[in-house]
Amino acid sequence: MKKDDRFAELDASGITAECLVETSDGWDGSPLPNYPEGTPVISIYRYVFPPHSVTADHFHKIINCGVVTKGQITLVCANGREKTVMAGEAVVEIDGEVHHGENCGDIPAEVIMFYAGDGKIPFSFPA
């Protein structure tokens, strides 16, 4: 693994860091929104999707991303575009586009999601 100078605490420790994603764009290539004004509030949530479950259609106004830790999740946009994210893969959500998430698998899927907001803007809005 290539040494990354941003992690001084890892020098000579044997600990490694692997970048799963680093981007200014959502998974579809659209630019991410600016951070909200005011004090930042970082939230991390664990979602568990039962087999064959589907979220309601929704959209986001804040930056959010996640890592699938078990199973797989498919993100489906209202316009038909979709992306399947497997266990161990990361995804940066798209801003303002109506979509839903679904677990098409036969086992529960688990996703750890990170939200960068201000504590006032909801994580998602119903479509």
Locate each region found by the language model.
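A short, N-terminal "cap"/entry segment at the start of jelly-roll beta-barrel domains
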Residues: 1-41, 126-127
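Short beta-strand segments in beta-sandwich/barrel cores
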Residues: 54-55, 71-76, 90
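Glycine- and acidic-residue-biased ligand/ion/polar-headgroup-sensing regions
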Residues: 61-79
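Short acidic-glycine-tyrosine-enriched beta hairpin
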Residues: 79-96
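Ligand-binding loop in jelly-roll beta-barrel domains
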Residues: 95-121
